[in-house]
């Protein structure tokens, strides 16, 4: 089992699919990485040599922001918005939807469980 960017990559899957187990690498980036390292799409992780795994690891470390670094970067960006006091920052601070979705109904995932209102009966 190959270990890339701190993630155990499944050996029985194709390389393009297995790379997507790393947070921050989707289908397009996985295809880019395979093209840079000259690995065919049909190749499985179990068929990779140690040199190819090392090459993939170096490419990801050099060119892409993944796993903990990516999560940290996103958290810093959100904190910056909250410190600025801009509209998006205020929405994050109040734990409401940020991208213009309606909140009168829906938005239960973001707002949490419905809070009962005292004295209101049907």
Curated annotation (Swiss-Prot):
> Which biological processes are named by the entry's GO terms?
translation
Provide the alphabetized UniProt keywords: Ribonucleoprotein, Ribosomal protein, RNA-binding, rRNA-binding, tRNA-binding
User: Which parts of this chain are annotated as the region Disordered?
Assistant: 95-122
Annotated InterPro entries: Rbsml_uS13_C, Ribosomal_uS13, Ribosomal_uS13-like_H2TH, Ribosomal_uS13_bac-type
- Domain of life (superkingdom): Bacteria
One GO cellular component term of this record is:
cytosol
- Coiled-coil annotated spans: none
Annotated GO MF terms: rRNA binding; structural constituent of ribosome; tRNA binding
Q: Give the family from UniProt.
A: Belongs to the universal ribosomal protein uS13 family.
- PANTHER family, per the entry: 30S RIBOSOMAL PROTEIN S13/40S RIBOSOMAL PROTEIN S18, SMALL RIBOSOMAL SUBUNIT PROTEIN US13M
Q: How does it assemble?
A: Part of the 30S ribosomal subunit. Forms a loose heterodimer with protein S19. Forms two bridges to the 50S subunit in the 70S ribosome.
Functional note: Located at the top of the head of the 30S subunit, it contacts several helices of the 16S rRNA. In the 70S ribosome it contacts the 23S rRNA (bridge B1a) and protein L5 of the 50S subunit (bridge B1b), connecting the 2 subunits; these bridges are implicated in subunit movement. Contacts the tRNAs in the A and P-sites.
Which protein, by its recorded name, is this?
Answer: Small ribosomal subunit protein uS13
Q: Which organism is it from?
A: Methylocella silvestris (strain DSM 15510 / CIP 108128 / LMG 27833 / NCIMB 13906 / BL2)
Q: What is the lineage of its organism?
A: Bacteria, Pseudomonadati, Pseudomonadota, Alphaproteobacteria, Hyphomicrobiales
Name the gene behind this protein.
rpsM
């Amino acid at each position: 089992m190959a270990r890339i960017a701190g993630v155990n990559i499944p050996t029985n899957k194709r390389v393009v699919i297995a790379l997507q187990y790393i947070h921050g690498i989707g289908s397009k980036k996985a295809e880019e990485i395979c093209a840079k390292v000259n690995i065919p799409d049909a190749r499985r992780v179990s068929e990779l040599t140690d040199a190819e795994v090392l090459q993939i690891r170096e490419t990801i470390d050099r060119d892409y922001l993944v796993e903990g670094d990516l999560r940290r970067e996103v958290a810093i960006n959100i904190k910056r918005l909250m410190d600025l006091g801009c509209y998006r920052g205020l929405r994050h601070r109040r734990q409401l939807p940020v991208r213009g979705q309606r909140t009168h109904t829906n938005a239960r995932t973001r707002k949490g469980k419905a809070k009962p209102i005292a004295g209101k009966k049907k």
